[in-house]
Amino acid sequence: MLVWALTTEFVEVVGIGLIGRIDALEVGGRSLAFWGLGQVGVAIKGPTGVLYVDPYLTDSDGEGGSLPRTFPPPLLPAEVSNASSVLLTHAHIDHTDPDTVLPLSEASPESSFVAPFTSRDTLVEAGLDEGRIVVPEVGEPLEVSGPTVTAVPSAHTELEYDPERGYPYLGYVIEWNGVTVYHAGDTVVYDGMVETLSAWDIDLAFVPINGRDFFRTRRNIIGNTDFRETAELTEILDIGLIVPTHYDLIEGNTSDPGHFVSHLYATNPMRPHKLLRPGELLLFVREADR
C-alpha cells in the first residue's frame, strides 16, 4: 500500500523561494520529495542530499534557436547551490545544457554528474572538469551521495549502442530511502524494455508523453512515447504513481496531458497519477511494502 501527499505551490516568478523551499523541507522515512522543473527536469530530495535530473534552466535553444520556452525556468542555474548529484540522460540541449550545468557546478562545487558518454563529451568540451563526471555501466548499481542509481537503456527513437562507448541515451532507476523511482529521460518502448524494468517494483515513474510524428521528425524534433504507450507501460509495470513528462516546455513540441489522463483512466481508473507543474512539490510516502 502506498500513501502520497502533495502541495500545489506554483512558482510564477523566476527563482522566487524555490531553493529555500527545497532546503527547508525535511524528508522522513520511506519518503522522497520531488519538485518539477519543466520538460523532464526534476529535483529529488531524500533524507540527505538533493539529486537533479536533466535540469534545463535556460533558454539556450530558444535564443536564436528553433525551440523557445513556453514559460521561464523556475530556478536560475547559479541558484542551485544544493545539488549533491546531477543525472543527465542524453546530450540534447534540453537535457544536457552547458549553460545550466556549468553555473550549477560552480554553485554546487561538491556535486557529481552521472551521464552517458555523449553528455560527457559535451560537458568536457564546454569546460566541466571530467573528474566530476561518471559514465555509468548499464545495469550496474552506482552509489551517488545517498541514492543508489542504476542506468538502463533508453531508445530515442531507436535503441542505439556503441560497442566501445555504450548507450548514448539512458534512463535511471533511483533507489533511495525505501522508494524506487524510474526516470526515463527521452524514450520510446523497445524490445526488452519491460523485461529490464520488471526487475524493480517501481513506486513512481517519470515517462514522456509527447509522442512523435512525421512533421516534428522533419523539423529534427525526435519523438518519444505518446500518451497511450505511457499509460499502457504504466499498467504493464504496475507503477505505483505515474508522472508524465515532456509535454509542457518547448513550443511546437507540446502535448495535452488531458489525453494522457483520460487514456490512463480508461485503462485503469484506480491508477494514481500526477501532473507536476514547474516549482510544485510532490511528497511521496511509502506506507508499507507493495
Residue spans of the language-model regions?
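Pre-active-site segment of Zn-dependent metallo-hydrolases
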Residues: T48-L88, P98-E106, L159, V189-A199
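Active-site HxH/HxHxD metal-binding segment of metal-dependent hydrolases
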Residues: P74-L142
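Metallo-beta-lactamase
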Residues: T7-G29, A115-V179, H263-A288
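Structural motif
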Residues: G49-L51, S84-S85, P147, V179-V181, ...
